[in-house]
Amino acid sequence: MSRTSDDIRKHLKVRRQKQRAILAMRWRCAQGGLEFEQLDTFYGAIRPYLCVAQFFGIMPLSNIRSRDPQDVKFKVRSIGLAVTGLFLLLGGMKTLVGANILFTEGLNAKNIVGLVFLIVGMVNWLNFVGFARSWSHIMLPWSSVDILMLFPPYKRGKRSLRSKVNVLALSVVVLAVGDHMLYYASGYCSYSMHILQCHTNHSRITFGLYLEKEFSDIMFIMPFNIFSMCYGFWLNGAFTFLWNFMDIFIVMTSIGLAQRFQQFAARVGALEGRHVPEALWYDIRRDHIRLCELASLVEASMSNIVFVSCANNVYVICNQALAIFTKLRHPINYVYFWYSLIFLLARTSLVFMTASKIHDASLLPLRSLYLVPSDGWTQEVQRFADQLTSEFVGLSGYRLFCLTRKSLFGMLATLVTYELMLLQIDAKSHKGLRCA
């Protein structure tokens, strides 16, 4: 009997030592520094991408290179906000000049796409400034949740959060660069053939002449030279980067939240078939509240970004799909058109599918609760079950729509219906080569 008591005391002593070691490590991680940087946190996963984004005036945060998220703050008097202001000024001038040219020539469903692209870019710069202002209120609770769930009793996932973020983000970046290069290649080919067939007096066709036409809004206020061409590439690239980063940021955020909810579900699932004291259910329910509060905070801060992203993607898909049955002039035009359309569809689907994992993972603990025997169904279990089913957990666009699988297929059905209607309305003839 005494031997059994000694074994129990030793077991409890070892358990208390492990708990104290975990608490001490959590405390050191909460102070920032090397211990926190070595953890697989969401801040550590997205920090390299935020550093790159600041070169384009996105997410104007101070001390973004710091390993401690407590040092990263939004400041009005900062270099990051000054860079954002510069992009807003230059982008605003480009948008106004472009709008003036379009209104002079006459607006239609085809040429307004470029103006919408610029306006969406301006709105997104402002949206990311707003998100940067609430950064500290989001990232500090998120980091505390990361510290909580990267130690026992929670288990880490098979793949690290950083590897998931890197694979998806870098894949989108590489495909986006290809799309951007094909845009210029297709435009230059069309311009060259147009000059050859319509202006026989032009003996030389250079890329510079194409850029003068492509950046006509910039040449409207600047002389044509190497500086204005580089400026045009730079500003156009910034708008393109912002357009892609908007979706990448939603994807990265969705991966970060979904992974924590999956870890939480795994902890609850590990209790299946075991007698669980009410105190443990209380601890689990308290952790779930922290997770849901974090998800709600992120959803409220990102609603404008999600709304603009989905609305813009749907508009561009509709506009591009309208030209599916249009006979294009050159092979490079076909390559660019299909590459761009498929890439946009894939990127939009990626946004919905990754974001839907948040909601799916938040409901996983219900499976384990349904297996709790009736004699173990306590008041805490009932509260936890009510908590899981009481409200939606995930991302949305101002609560007008939620990013779920059902929303994705509903959007695709709407696109097909809308596209069929547009194809009936669009009665323009594309025959012949216009030499305007």
Swiss-Prot record:
GO BP, sorted A to Z: monoatomic ion transmembrane transport; sensory perception of sweet taste; sensory perception of taste; signal transduction
Tissue expression notes: Expressed in sweet sensing neurons of classical chemosensory sensilla, but also in two supersensitive neurons of atypical taste sensilla.
Cross-referenced InterPro entries: Gustatory_rcpt
Membrane topology: Multi-pass membrane protein
Primary localization class, coarse: membrane
Membrane-spanning residues: 79-99, 112-132, 165-185, 215-235, 238-258, 305-325, 335-355
Residue numbers on the Cytoplasmic membrane side: 1-78, 133-164, 236-237, 326-334
Protein role: One of the few identified sugar gustatory receptors identified so far with glucose being its primary ligand and which mediates acceptance behavior.
PANTHER family xrefs: GUSTATORY RECEPTOR (PTHR21421), GUSTATORY RECEPTOR FOR SUGAR TASTE 61A-RELATED (PTHR21421:SF34)
Protein name as catalogued: Gustatory receptor for sugar taste 61a
Higher taxonomy: Eukaryota, Metazoa, Ecdysozoa, Arthropoda, Hexapoda
This protein's encoding gene: Gr61a
